[in-house]
């Protein structure tokens, strides 16, 4: 039977109440992934890396292990585990198996589609991050990969508890371009990014995740300055302008910003490949990589196709589908077709 997860009654209206609610939601795991991982844990020939690779096909499994390893009662170090392999090593296989046995495992068709759609966006973001940045920052590939996969994870329990609210937010903010602050105050009583930041801190997610939310909430002036430079069509002039402000250059070139760039590329692409929001993040990515907009667009399209080959699922939308559409065509939200 499908899992009953939607919370009845009125949605919370304060940050504290939202965090308390989302902390209590149990996110289901696809049964086929669950069975494969449990078999690997019980096979003494499999390494932690083998198990981590199997787990990454189920974002909910990854999140559960990271949360457990980074919980204050379990964390043996002050800093959160930045990768799944480190988290598994902290827990050990026995405790990891006990954790998995507590998780709800369901046939994938019984997992609510709003949750699966947002997890697909996270998987697409992880592919974009790995393809665009991991080869250039090879020693940091695990931080890039896992941080990108988990960046939007605070939205996953929200997709279970109040799917209609999240769906309405996507319709009005992502598709219709309404003012996010007004819509979010009306729907949630708080800003979505502030809620995600609070949940990420409560879960002690990797620092690159919380740093991304801090940038969006507290460092928007610097982001606007960098975007202004990124709009300059002369690449040499771009670099000269950035070099003229060393503090801004250091701020923008932080490796943690790869997580934010990849997730905004993946989220904006849900509408279509020709929209102003996506263009802004493509321009910022081009400046970060010190290459042209055309080169970044080509790379992003290639990574979208690679993600679709690995992650696309029946009845879910993947932006790679839109690569064969007319360039200016955008994906309408289902409620826009009524």
Residue ranges and their predicted role:
Residues 1-164, 180, 184, 191, ...:
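Conserved alpha-helical "signature site"
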Residues 160-175:
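Alpha-helical transmembrane segments of multi-pass integral membrane proteins
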Residues 171-178, 230-234:
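Acidic, His- and aromatic-enriched active-site or binding-groove loops in soluble protein domains
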Residues 197-215, 219, 223-338:
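Regulatory/sensor and coupling segments of signal-transduction and defense proteins
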């Amino acid at each position: 039977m499908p899992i009953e997860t939607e919370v009845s009654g009125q949605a919370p209206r304060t940050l504290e109440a939202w965090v308390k609610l989302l902390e209590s939601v149990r996110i289901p795991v696809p049964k086929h992934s669950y069975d494969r991982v449990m078999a690997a844990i019980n096979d003494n020939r499999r390494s932690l890396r083998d198990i981590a690779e199997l787990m990454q096909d189920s974002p909910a499994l990854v999140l559960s292990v990271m949360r457990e390893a980074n919980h204050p009662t379990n964390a043996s170090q002050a800093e959160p585990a930045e990768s799944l392999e480190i988290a598994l090593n902290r827990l050990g296989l026995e405790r990891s198996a006990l954790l998995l046995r507590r998780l709800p495992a369901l046939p994938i068709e019984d997992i609510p589609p709003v949750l699966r759609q947002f997890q697909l966006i996270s998987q697409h973001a992880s592919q974009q991050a790995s393809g665009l940045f991991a080869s250039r920052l090879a020693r940091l590939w695990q931080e890039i990969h896992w941080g990108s996969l988990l960046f939007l994870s605070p939205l996953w329990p929200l997709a279970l508890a109040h799917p209609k609210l999240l769906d309405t937010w996507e319709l009005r903010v992502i598709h219709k371009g309404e003012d996010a602050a007004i819509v979010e105050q009306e729907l949630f009583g708080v800003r979505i990014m502030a809620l995600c930041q609070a949940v990420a801190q409560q879960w002690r997610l990797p620092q690159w995740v919380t740093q991304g939310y801090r940038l969006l909430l507290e460092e928007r002036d610097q982001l606007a300055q960098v975007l202004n430079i990124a709009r300059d069509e002369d690449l040499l002039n771009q670099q000269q302008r950035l070099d003229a402000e060393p503090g801004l250059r250091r701020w923008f070139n932080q490796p943690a910003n790869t997580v934010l760039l990849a997730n905004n590329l993946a989220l904006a692409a849900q509408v279509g490949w020709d929209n102003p929001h996506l263009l802004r993040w493509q321009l910022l990515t081009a400046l970060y990589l010190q290459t042209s907009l055309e080169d970044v667009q080509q790379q992003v399209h290639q990574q979208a196709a690679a993600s679709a080959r690995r992650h696309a699922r029946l009845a879910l939308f993947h932006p790679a589908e839109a690569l064969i559409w007319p360039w200016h065509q955008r994906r309408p939200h289902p409620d826009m077709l009524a």
